[in-house]
Amino acid sequence: MPTSVARTGGNLPNGAFIPEIWAQRLNDKYYAQCFLPEITNSNYTGNITGKGGSVKIRNRPTVQINKHVVGAPIKYQDITDTFVELFINQANEFAFQIDDVDAAQSDINIMNELTIDASYQAKIAVEIQVLGSIYGDAGVVLPPTAITSANVLAWLIQAEVALEKANTPPSDRWVILPPEIGGMIQLSDLKNVYMTGDAKTILRGEMSNGRIGMIGSMEVYISNNLTTIGGVTQCLAGHKSAVTYASQFTNLKTLTLQDYHADAIRGLNVFGFKTLIPGALVSLPATYPAIGN
């Protein structure tokens, strides 16, 4: 029943001639930004055969360099072969149904709207799982730090130094932070050139959704998908080669249900991830004043 203007008297008292109007445009819905394609590699996605499979990834052997001694016999090294294994051992699913009557009477394509939402939610769910796991694999772990706009630069430079010492290539380095720390960066001496007028500012590059530029050689991404435990957020820095990730929707079906007058869609997303180079991954546990939810 629509809300009517207050009235007195007996003329048209029930509001029967005031229609309810439903907008065809759905209310805007916002989704967490996802950055797995930017911070991990997907070199082995083509090897996925389904949940329960695995991919053996061979490591390049290390050749020893010895000093040459004139007249001494040459010593030939026994080469050690090693590998790591990427297990496709995780899966997420979704399933929903729309009654035929609802589909026929609706003025919007409900199935299409729900499918769009499912695609976003699937990406977010996987990213939360990956980010919530790989920080435990980091070869470098900084001490928990209370971050402010005064110390955020020194804190981030520690991560850059760790990546330099690991000999990671300058390209494809990254750091992923919560929005609050992103805000501190913009309030600090790292603020971008448009705010400071300083062509030598450390924070540089174009700003886009979830990306606020570069600090040193690290792309800076802002995410709501980081893990927080006991008030400590597990921020991460690394190189794209550090973690490999493989994912596929192996079972996406549209069904006509047998026992109901309804259609349904269900999907199965199988995936796996593996830290290949722990030294190219830095854990930056941080505390900060939270804003909002």
Where in this protein do the model-derived segments appear?
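Short Gly/aromatic-enriched secondary-structure transition segments
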Residues: 70-77
